[in-house]
Amino acid sequence: MAMTNCLLALAIAGVVLVSLPGLSRGDGECNPSGAIRSSTTHRCQDCCKAGQSYPTYTCSPPTTGSSTDAVMTLNDFDAGGDGGGPSECDEMYHSNTELVVALSTGWYAGGSRCGKSVRINANGRSVLAKVVDECDSQRGCDEEHAYQPPCRPNVVDASQAVWDALGITGEDVGEYDITWSDA
């Protein structure tokens, strides 16, 4: 009887650990799910380089309710900009004067945040921005993605208007540590 109970307890523990990989790792982080190797180099500064491998992700770090750590990057949502094609949520381009963002694949959550506002905190300020696109963490290095690598799993890709509203200017524009939450 004791042996049966012990085996049952081990089986349950195994199921829990397999079902909740974040608990078995103990870090709650998002690990790469694969990689893309670029076959060509393009002229833009941030474009993929031939022969280089870029990690892909199907996840993002877990959101923590009131504030989730992220890296804000600058995106051009206008037609012809470095954001690639039209926004995933509405198949439209957006002016960079609009307070809009794209979220990494895991946070984009299959479009469940489309049209919703997120609160971004940085530089002692806070701003609300509308989610209009996915910053694709699974694909990249192609024309659809403006030949840029896949998005890292912890990115909030923001329009110039978001940067301006947060008072982030000059050499700080490009990448900036922020926190964000659903509004």
From Swiss-Prot:
CDD domains registered for this protein in UniProt: DPBB_kiwellin-like
Q: Which organism is it from?
A: Oryza sativa subsp. japonica
Any Pfam family hit? KWL1
Q: Where is the signal peptide?
A: 1-26
Q: Which InterPro entries match?
A: Kiwellin-like, RlpA-like_sf
GO CC list: extracellular region
Q: Write down the superkingdom of origin.
A: Eukaryota
From the Swiss-Prot or TrEMBL record, state where the protein is found: Secreted
Q: What is this protein called?
A: Putative ripening-related protein 1
Concerning its family, UniProt says: Belongs to the kiwellin family.
Q: Which Gene3D superfamilies match?
A: RlpA-like domain
Q: What UniProt keywords apply to this chain's record, in alphabetical order?
A: Secreted, Signal
